Amino acid sequence: MALQRRFFQFVIITLLIPSFILGYTSAVHEDPPHDYHLEEYGYDFKAYPSYITTIGDNDFGSSMSHENGIFGLRKVDYGMDRVLDASKTVNVDDFGAKGDGRDDTKAFEKAWKAACSSTSSAVLLVPKKNYLVRPISFSGPCKSGLTMQIYGTIEASDDRSDYRKDGRHWLVFDSVQNLRVEGGGTINGNGKIWWQNSCKTNKALPCKDAPTALTFYKSKHVIVKNLKIENAQQIHVSFDNCVNVQASNLMVTAPENSPNTDGIHVTGTQNIHISSCVIGTGDDCISIVNGSRKVRVNDITCGPGHGISIGSLGYGNSEAHVSDVVVNGAKLCGTTNGVRIKTWQGGSGSASNIKFQNVEMHNVENPIIIDQNYCDQDKPCQEQSSAVQVKNVVYQNIKGTCASNVAITFDCSKRFPCQGIVLEDVDLEIEGGAAAKALCNNVELSETGVVSPHCQEEGGEEEEEAS
């Protein structure tokens, strides 16, 4: 009987173990990807029903409601983490790269071709050495997901003649899907030679384009994280016509006087989340321009630089649109601007449905600014009748100090005044504790909570606080 009992126990265990394993495996693989939660942004889309009115054909509250279309961003790895351990590894050294300061461009081209043509996911490995690389395009589409693991330093050539074929780009990822670029290494644009030859540094020189250090163009499902990008020739990182992007844990640095060295530039891109980045450059820490929507920015440290900017928009009488932007959680120190919207006269289109919240300013020259008369040229810009419409912009929980006596500037168009602008719990003062001013022209404004300074028409009295 004892033997028979043991036999039955063995049969039961044998039957149960596969079922448990199958059930566990199913549970692991069938868990849906985790959505970004509303609480993560602190963005209550129903918070302003009483004083944001219907503008045009759309209501601001409904246009910013919690929908799959708005919050299409997901905390997913696009399947890359699950297969990373089993990926094919392609080492640039195996293709002739030396990492000794001599030109390794050809080796990088060959290694990329091998990784991109792999039918299984691949890891392109850049070891901990210093690799000199001339302008290069990492072009797709690739046959499978790909990770570029950068442990070392990729350094740009400082010979400007190397950029004759394409003077606007250095490293380009073109038309790649399911891409990760990470590893803790450094991308060094070696930009000093370009800054010295900029018309902004020496006005006697002609104005010419300089390369963007790292460009992602027409790419989808992109993760860029854990990298240092420094001393770009011009813009450091550009996401151009991309969809579904996560950029996180990036350190972006260049000298304060380096011209046009924007940190992260977003153009024509949808569904992008920029988080946990430290940026200090000679231009905008983050710039968001035409064609961008569903942009989420949080946990940013900015300075030196020109702040976090939407625009410029409408240059050369062009049409431009930016919408659905949330900046939640930023610290700006010693920057020329804090949170800024800038548009040229003569343009058309709109910058709409935008929220800046939980922003801390320290000695910032222009903490809050909307400038519909932006003019970045030596000659005065001609006054024009058309403008990019700025509407439905919320500033919530903005606190700190300014380096000038004006903390808030709304310089809006006479013909296309700013509409649906909201200040809620804004407290800004001059460094040292003195009261600051707010100058406001042609703006439809509401205030709620404690707001200081109050808005006033330039040369006029303070507006009454909204009930």
Swiss-Prot record:
Domain of life, per lineage: Eukaryota
What span is annotated as the signal peptide, if there is one?
Answer: 1-27
Q: What is its EC number?
A: 3.2.1.15
* Enzymatic reactions: (1,4-alpha-D-galacturonosyl)n+m + H2O = (1,4-alpha-D-galacturonosyl)n + (1,4-alpha-D-galacturonosyl)m
Q: What class of enzyme is it?
A: hydrolase
Q: Which residues form the active site?
A: D283, H306
What glycosylation sites does the entry record?
A: N290
Q: Tell me, what is one Gene Ontology molecular-function annotation carried by this entry?
A: polygalacturonase activity
One GO BP annotation is: carbohydrate metabolic process
A GO CC term assigned to this protein in UniProt: extracellular region
Q: Which UniProt keywords apply?
A: Cell wall, Cell wall biogenesis/degradation, Fruit ripening, Glycoprotein, Glycosidase, Hydrolase, Secreted, Signal
Q: Which InterPro entries match?
A: Glyco_hydro_28, PbH1, Pectin_lyas_fold, Pectin_lyase_fold/virulence
Q: Where is this chain's protein located in or outside the cell?
A: Secreted; Secreted, Cell wall
Q: What is its main location?
A: secreted
What is the role of the protein in this entry?
Acts in concert with the pectinesterase, in the ripening process. Is involved in cell wall metabolism, specifically in polyuronide degradation.
Q: Which family does it belong to?
A: Belongs to the glycosyl hydrolase 28 family.
**UniProt name for this protein:** Polygalacturonase
Q: Which organism is it from?
A: Actinidia deliciosa
At the highest ranks, the source species' classification is: Eukaryota, Viridiplantae, Streptophyta, Embryophyta, Tracheophyta
